Amino acid sequence: MLKTGEIAKHPRDSDLNHPSLSQTVCTALQIALVDLLKSWNIYPDSVTGHSSGEIAAAYAAGALSMYDAMSVAYYRGVVASQLLHDQPNRGAMMAVGMSAEEVQPYLDEFQPRQLVVACINSPSSVTISGDILAIDALGQTLKDQQVFSRRLEVGVAYHSPHIEQVAEQYHSLIGHIQPRGLDQITEDKRGKWPLFFSSVTGKMAPLQELHARYWVSNLVGQVKFAQSLRTLCFETNSQRGGNTGATRIRRAGAAQKPSVDCLIEIGPHAALSGPINQILQADAKLNAADIAYISILTRKTNAVTTALGAVATLVSLNYPIDFGTINRPAGTKKGRTPQLLTNIPTYVWNHTRSYW
């Protein structure tokens, strides 16, 4: 059980980054933010996620109930914790400022499956996962060649052969989840459920396919975030007729254009701001589309400020926000009419006096 005091501890004394806590806490926070945005009448047209971020994305899409989403996250933390303590060879992960194609020759210098490209974050950013000694050796090589690299604060080599040791156990623990397709969503609510673009496949995924085996692939397989986000940007409207997995046929010769105007990151920090900007800038059409990016939360910044800043960006894009709910959230007294302040200082129109 998570003690509330754990969050308030100094980072070096807190176990919040331990997988037994971090997986569940992060997903719970993301789900809460999804519900908060819905209460403000903010509904996405499409969603995608990076690694475990897909769990909350599936919840936002209506594929997973809150109970099932939290089960997927909790048991992910359980098996990761088990691997952390029982693994014969310690694992690690490292962010590298190269493309998957550029970094592969470096990985080929090691034994097969010792190091893998775990995440393709953007055209110029990947995450490498594997044996800790190999990670350290690769880091030194890249440092010598003045290539950016940074070890991540994780003790498990996610999205690598290391995870295969707990894959079947994870599947058995989450085998009870029941993903919901559009046929299980009432007719009046279907239009508000977003499309789900998978970073496991890089394509749109029908909601009913987000079953237990999918979440095993999400834990073990490569994260194709750059591909899934790019696909989302171009195919949101073309697929909007129905989230059934069937692609709407394009008119012959029709030019593919970006179909989104704003990307919102939902999580404890703007962790994907760099990769997202790199994805948008690397594609001429996406770069020209001037797609806005905002994060609901930013580390060491007041959460009210960042959340309302995100709302302000959406307002500037003419999105219909429910200001009544924002200004008078649930739990406040109802029936009280806001009072107009009439005794505040008047605006100074006389600017003839000089002060400097």
Placement of each model-derived feature along the sequence:
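Short amphipathic alpha-helices in soluble, non-transmembrane regions
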Residues: 107-109, 135-145
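Short helix-loop capping/hinge segments that flank enzyme active sites or metal/cofactor-binding pockets
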Residues: 183-213, 308, 314
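FabD-like malonyl-/acyl-CoA
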Residues: 1-109, 147-157, 161, 166, ...
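Structured core elements
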Residues: 48, 95, 116-118, 127-129, ...
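Acyltransferase loading domain of fatty acid and polyketide assembly lines
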Residues: 1-21, 91-93, 113-121, 200-201, ...
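Helix N-cap motif at beta-to-alpha junctions
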Residues: 100, 130-135
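Short Gly/Ser/Thr- and Asp/Glu-enriched loop/turn motifs at secondary-structure junctions
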Residues: 89-91, 119-125, 153, 189-193
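Flexible, low-complexity segments
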Residues: 25-44, 96-97, 180, 210, ...
